[in-house]
């Protein structure tokens, strides 16, 4: 489906496609999702699209929010919330449940539901669980509403660091050493689970990185230099996800590459390099979004290295059956190998984020990037494909 073949009324001028920008959510990345939505709302072409902002509160309520992107920015080192933007503390937005009817409804207790009109495409800019992990995508598939980005399977795989690495390995992509501690392992025998990590450290050395298995934006990650810090690091990761993954330190350069789906298939951007953090132990949430640690775009690589990382980024996109967009993160080791760390199916998408910067350097400015993603979603059908 494209903007040219939307149903039209003979009495009215052609209507513009309606884009619902959905943001916020129940994950730890709620605030940065709001910031991302503000950037999309500022950039989207209002002469081409009608826009409906829908925020999901931290407790999961779908709220009609003010279309005021200027209020959706980081201020005083603090990210905004949907609760601050919601037009009501009680009302809720209801998606269509009939694929033949894409009308969205707004309902408040004790009031007659109000029709908000049809939605032609959803632009979900949620990060983390309950938004980027296939749950929202499944809801939209059931509703028959096209949406930007990866489908159910790719979103689920792209959110779980363990299964992502398993898929990469099965397709011949190199991954670093890791060990997974599942919730039942820790609950059943903490000592045995701890020994599993200590044995891993004995094989691969300290430091280790202890991470929530299904979180992003570097939230909940701790660099652990020795056994003394392990329990605290595990507790911090488990605050965000009962399943954790522990990774060995890979010595090398951090290289990122964006992938964007075109009509003739996915293409990779110029790569970027994340320089070693000066005031941070690693490239964490504060470095990414608060202190805005700049990346180097394009990355200072040889032509051969650039071609190889772009090829591998597209291969990772294809291996996980992604759609729309992906940011692929690699380490370029001292041996000259590219080791894939992870993909992000909805990467940081503010104008200062690496994904838009890489495409800016590749010739696609932020507003055009938003437009290409919406157009790709409109062309795509829901259901099996």
Swiss-Prot record:
Which InterPro entries is this protein grouped with? Answer: ATP-grasp, ATP_grasp_subdomain_1, D-Ala_lig_Van_CS, D_ala_D_ala, Dala_Dala_lig_C, Dala_Dala_lig_N, PreATP-grasp_dom_sf
Q: What does this protein do?
A: Cell wall formation.
Keyword Ribonucleoprotein applies? no
Q: Name one GO biological process term.
A: peptidoglycan biosynthetic process
UniProt-listed Enzyme Commission number(s): 6.3.2.4
| A Pfam family this chain is assigned to | Dala_Dala_lig_C
Specify which residues bind Mg(2+) 1 according to the UniProt entry for this protein: 329, 342
> Residues in domain ATP-grasp?
165-375
Required co-factor? Mg(2+); Mn(2+)
Keyword Hydrolase on entry: no
Localization per Swiss-Prot or TrEMBL: Cytoplasm
Cofactor notes: Binds 2 magnesium or manganese ions per subunit.
Task: Enumerate the residues binding ATP.
Answer: 201-256
Reactions catalysed, semicolon-separated, are:
2 D-alanine + ATP = D-alanyl-D-alanine + ADP + phosphate + H(+)
Name this protein carries in UniProt: D-alanine--D-alanine ligase
* Major localisation: cytoplasm
Which organism is this protein's natural source? Streptomyces avermitilis (strain ATCC 31267 / DSM 46492 / JCM 5070 / NBRC 14893 / NCIMB 12804 / NRRL 8165 / MA-4680)
For this UniProt record, the keywords arranged alphabetically read as follows: ATP-binding, Cell shape, Cell wall biogenesis/degradation, Cytoplasm, Ligase, Magnesium, Manganese, Metal-binding, Nucleotide-binding, Peptidoglycan synthesis
